[in-house]
Amino acid sequence: MEFKEQVLDLLADVAENDVVKENPDVEIFEEGIIDSFQTVGLLLEIQNRLGIEVSIMDFDRDEWATPNKIVEALEELR
């Protein structure tokens, strides 16, 4: 499975919403697709499923605003 597809699947699971796969440029925080509690779950799932540790200190909502931006950020951290 392609890395981007893995990340989008993970996002869809955490958000409980497939819109992140259908529109990877959707603003997930502005649109209320992911809230602050789900953000913590997202970071844990990234570590568990992808083996990429992301500190809450490294998390920036602007840099992680869309699924595509999240994929880019995680590719840099791989």
UniProtKB/Swiss-Prot annotation:
UniProt feature coiled coil, ranges: none
Modification after translation, per record: 4'-phosphopantetheine is transferred from CoA to a specific serine of apo-DCP.
Sorted UniProt keywords: Cell wall biogenesis/degradation, Cytoplasm, Phosphopantetheine, Phosphoprotein
Subcellular location: Cytoplasm
Pathway terms, separated by semicolons: Cell wall biogenesis; lipoteichoic acid biosynthesis
GO CC terms of this entry: cytoplasm
Pfam families per record: PP-binding (PF00550)
O-(pantetheine 4'-phosphoryl)serine carried by residues: S36
Keyword Phosphoprotein: yes
Keyword Phosphoprotein among record annotations: yes
Domain Carrier: 1-78
GO biological-process terms attached to the record: cell wall organization; lipoteichoic acid biosynthetic process
Gene Ontology molecular function terms on file: D-alanyl carrier activity
Summary of the function given for this chain in its UniProt record: Carrier protein involved in the D-alanylation of lipoteichoic acid (LTA). The loading of thioester-linked D-alanine onto DltC is catalyzed by D-alanine--D-alanyl carrier protein ligase DltA. The DltC-carried D-alanyl group is further transferred to cell membrane phosphatidylglycerol (PG) by forming an ester bond, probably catalyzed by DltD. D-alanylation of LTA plays an important role in modulating the properties of the cell wall in Gram-positive bacteria, influencing the net charge of the cell wall.
Entry similarity comment: Belongs to the DltC family.
Protein name (Swiss-Prot/TrEMBL): D-alanyl carrier protein
Organism, scientific name: Staphylococcus haemolyticus (strain JCSC1435)
